[in-house]
Regions:
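S-adenosyl-L-methionine-dependent methyltransferase catalytic module, highlighting the catalytic core
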Residues: 96, 104-112, 122-223
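A short helix->loop->beta-strand "cap" motif at the edges of active sites that frequently abuts
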Residues: 55, 118-121
Length: 223
């Protein structure tokens, strides 16, 4: 998938729900004590937060689309994460879904996330995988490169090291591409882009099985 913007969320909300459902399931499998409070950094229109029914949902979103998330009942701060005034030692989960690569100082951002989380709480990070198969094959044409927008690129090793240096223990890591991003690929059958995803299955399957997909997820615990 290419890098997504606010208009992409609005036009393809059901597709993103399918993607986020898989990430939600992954988070839940590592949150044995439950999630009563969740913060989504870069929450857009709140489509990821929508999955956390019964939880107190917070978001940080600097763009105007924050209004849509707020209208859904999420508590949203319309500012940048670095400037956001948020309660410390409060959240069971902080989500950074394709956000960390945009930040000026990744270490500062992770330090702030650490302070916001309760002891032993969970940080979920999803970022492009520059160590993946797509990046190696396509080089400067890799769609996730976006040098004007992505200030950082990460490999499994580099982000694991960064998380550990900022007080986190990685509980789980995985990498995926194509239809393997979806919780239920069958739901995408009516979408035009899904035909391209089907043709790309040999690549997507190989990349996913090798742990060299275009995106990667980290579930980390505050220690």
């Amino acid at each position: 998938m290419n890098y997504h913007r606010d208009e992409d969320y609005l036009k393809n909300e059901s597709m993103f729900k399918n993607i986020f459902q898989k990430r939600f399931n992954l988070i839940k499998s590592h949150s044995r004590s439950g999630i009563s409070t969740v913060l989504d950094v870069g929450c857009s229109n709140g489509v990821f937060l929508d999955l956390f029914s019964g939880s107190e949902t917070w978001g940080v979103e600097p763009s105007k689309i924050a209004d849509r998330a707020e209208r859904k009942g999420h508590m949203v701060l319309n500012t940048f994460f670095e400037q956001a005034k948020l309660p410390e030692n409060y959240f069971d989960l902080v989500i950074m879904n394709h956000v960390l690569e945009h930040m000026d100082n990744s270490a500062v951002v992770l330090t702030k996330a650490y302070k916001l989380l309760k002891p032993n709480a969970i940080l979920f990070v999803d970022v492009p995988n520059i160590g993946g198969l797509g990046s190696r094959i396509l080089g400067k044409h890799w769609p996730y490169l976006l040098p004007k927008e992505h200030k950082h690129q990460f490999t499994k090793g580099s982000l694991t090291k960064l998380l550990e240096e900022n007080g986190f223990k990685v509980l789980h890591w995985e990498s995926r591409s194509g239809i393997f991003e979806f919780a239920n690929p069958i739901r995408e059958l009516g979408r035009k882009r899904f035909l391209l995803d089907l043709f790309a299955i040999p690549y997507s399957l190989t990349a996913t099985l090798l742990g060299m997909g275009d995106s990667m997820s980290f579930v980390a615990k505050k220690i």
